[in-house]
Structure formats: structure tokens, C-alpha cells
């Protein structure tokens, strides 16, 4: 797979670099305490962890985290959410936070109403139960119970917060097609690597 550079992706940095006052740094002791509960962070290098801490500070400064349906979140839990959501940004920087402003958190899986029109023109309406959702130019939505399940078993291979943030990165260029904003020179290599990995995945599950 094509590897993103350790530093910010140049295109994102140039397109989405915001001339804003830096957010206040996170309390070092609070970060250390939070880190103990997020084993995914234990594998990070010191450099990557420092970058993640800075990104998490930006996340908490710029995003409104709204618990719903009677859920209450303390500062440590909000920091957990910020850290998980910012893990996919380690290769692209704070520009990956652009385009949305609110994280909604339900206590557990939530239901949404769906509809679609089939080939015969018949409208079908139904309820769908979700553990996370990312709206184009809208909020990111998570189930707190499933975030906690991911923290309890972090190497299972799925993390709903990371998954939904990947959709936010995908949408940065205006097209939800599995490809985040990339320098033109990387686009062909990205497509080839993505197709190769997808084909390998299909072989495993077929």
C-alpha cells in the first residue's frame, strides 16, 4: 500500500491550513491518565503521540461533543473520543477536521429511518440500527457502548470512531468514493494499491 508521509500530506496542508490561534494544549496529566485506558495509543512512537495530542486538542477546541438520550460524558471520556477520532489524522494533519462541527454520542446503538425506491418504483421505508454514522458536511454520530467495546478489545480489527472518521476524510474532496484528497502524483498509485488490497480481501471472504 502507498504510505502516507509521517508529516502532513502537502495538499491537505496547503488547502486546509487554517490561520487560527492554536488551541490550548491538553493537560499532560489528564492525557497520561486517558492514555492508560486506550491501548491503541500504546503502540505509538513518542513523535506520533505528541502529534496525536496536538490533534486531539484541536478536535476538542473546534468540535462540539453532544451526548444524547441521557448520556453524560466527563472530560476524560471526551478526550478518549477526540484521541480515537484523531488517529486517522496522523498522516494528514488538522486539515482533516475541516467541514463539520459536531460529534453526537448516543448511549448505545441508535435507530434511523431509511427509505429507497426499488427498480419497480416502489418506495420502501424501514428502520436501521446503527453504531455510527457520518453525514456529509454534517455531524459524526457514535454509539458510546460500542466505543467502549472497541476500547475493551482494541485489536479486534474494528473501531467505530476510526471508521466514521475515515468517512469524514473521504468526503474532504467533495466525493465520497473511498479516496481522500491526495497529490495528483499519488492518485494512480493509491487506486492501484486500493484495488489490489480489495481484491485480496474478496479472495479471503469468498
Question: Which residue stretches match the model-derived regions?
Answer:
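Metalloprotease/metallohydrolase-associated module, dominated by Zn2+-dependent proteases
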Residues: 17, 21, 30, 35-42, ...
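Catalytic glutamate of the conserved HExxH
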Residues: 157-173
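Short, surface-exposed loop/turn segments at secondary-structure junctions
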Residues: 65-72
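Charged, compositionally biased N-terminal leader segments and the immediate start
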Residues: 2-32
Amino acid at each position: 500500500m502507498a504510505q502516507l508521509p509521517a508529516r502532513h500530506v502537502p495538499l491537505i496542508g496547503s488547502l486546509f491550513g487554517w490561520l487560527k490561534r492554536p488551541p490550548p494544549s491538553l493537560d499532560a496529566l489528564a492525557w497520561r491518565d486517558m492514555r492508560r485506558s486506550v491501548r491503541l495509543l500504546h503502540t505509538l512512537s513518542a513523535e506520533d503521540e505528541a502529534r496525536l495530542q496536538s490533534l486531539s486538542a484541536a478536535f476538542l477546541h473546534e468540535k462540539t461533543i453532544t451526548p444524547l438520550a441521557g448520556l453524560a460524558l466527563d472530560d476524560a471520556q471526551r478526550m478518549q473520543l477526540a484521541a480515537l477520532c484523531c488517529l486517522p489524522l496522523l498522516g494528514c494533519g488538522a486539515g482533516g477536521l475541516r467541514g463539520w462541527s459536531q460529534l453526537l454520542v448516543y448511549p448505545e446503538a441508535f435507530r434511523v429511518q431509511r427509505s429507497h425506491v426499488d427498480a419497480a418504483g416502489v418506495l420502501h421505508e424501514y428502520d436501521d440500527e446503527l453504531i455510527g454514522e457520518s453525514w456529509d458536511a454534517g455531524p459524526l454520530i457514535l454509539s458510546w457502548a460500542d466505543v467502549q467495546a472497541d476500547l475493551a478489545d482494541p485489536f479486534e480489527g474494528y473501531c467505530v470512531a476510526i471508521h466514521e472518521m475515515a468517512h469524514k476524510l473521504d468526503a474532504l474532496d467533495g466525493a465520497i468514493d473511498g479516496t481522500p484528497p491526495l497529490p495528483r502524483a499519488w492518485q494512480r498509485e493509491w487506486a492501484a494499491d486500493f484495488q489490489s488490497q480489495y481484491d485480496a480481501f474478496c479472495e479471503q471472504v469468498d
